[in-house]
């Protein structure tokens, strides 16, 4: 779709490139895992002495290919991250206020500050959803970003970070104590996994809604300004 607003075009372009490179990154991760397990399997076979019809150097070749794909996953992840940053930066520009003490650029930067970003997420995702909905209401648009989903994502992100903080504890002592209660250990791992999956789904929902809503705002404002200018010329 062709947009009149340059800001809307930047938002849409970065959004699409972010998804394209993220898909490429996922493919690279899968291929890296496949070749890694092939290399591991061949290594086990070679070490067992059962090398009939197998090139002993095959596992080395597979390991090298796996290493290449692992490197590519890192490269693709960085590219995806760059486009994601550009996307959220431009999206935040659509709801930025003249009296804001924190600019869109700083809002994005603070999301990369360890520990602090867990709290800052509330002022990033949830605040964005509230501002977008306020702007859309003013512009009489039906598009909406779910404030509840954004808030829930921030809360789950906080809980996941807290659970991850257990890594700073004595792991051997922790695992030894939990090993006596395998059901508790399994439940803890299951809950943490579910939290991460739900958080990811909510984040994807936020991104999709933020894309549509921010473009709606950028386009509406651009068209309104264009109409005002045209009216001024004809007056």
Residue spans of the language-model regions?
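Membrane-helix interface segments in multi-pass membrane proteins
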Residues: 28-76, 147-152, 156-201
């Amino acid at each position: 779709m062709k947009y009149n607003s340059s800001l809307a075009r930047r938002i849409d372009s970065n959004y699409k490139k972010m998804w394209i490179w993220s898909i490429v990154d996922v493919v690279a991760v899968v291929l890296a895992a496949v070749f890694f397990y092939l290399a591991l399997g061949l290594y086990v076979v070679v070490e067992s002495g059962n090398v009939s019809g197998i090139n002993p150097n095959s596992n080395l070749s597979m390991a090298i290919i796996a290493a290449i794909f692992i490197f590519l996953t890192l490269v693709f992840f960085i590219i995806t991250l760059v486009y994601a940053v550009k996307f959220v930066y431009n999206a935040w520009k659509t709801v930025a206020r003249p009296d804001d003490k924190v600019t869109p650029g700083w809002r994005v930067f603070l999301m990369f500050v360890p520990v602090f970003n867990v709290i800052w997420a509330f002022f990033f995702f949830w605040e964005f959803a509230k501002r977008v909905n306020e702007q859309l209401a003013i512009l009489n648009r039906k598009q909406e970003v779910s404030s509840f989903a954004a808030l829930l994502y921030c809360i789950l992100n906080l809980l996941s970070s807290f659970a991850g903080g257990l890594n700073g504890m004595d792991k051997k002592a922790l695992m030894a104590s939990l090993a006596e209660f395998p059901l508790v250990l399994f439940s803890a791992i299951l809950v943490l996994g579910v939290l991460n999956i739900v958080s990811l789904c909510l984040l994807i929902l936020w991104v999709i809604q933020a894309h549509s809503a921010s473009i709606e705002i950028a386009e509406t404002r651009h068209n309104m300004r264009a109409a005002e200018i045209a009216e001024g010329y004809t007056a």
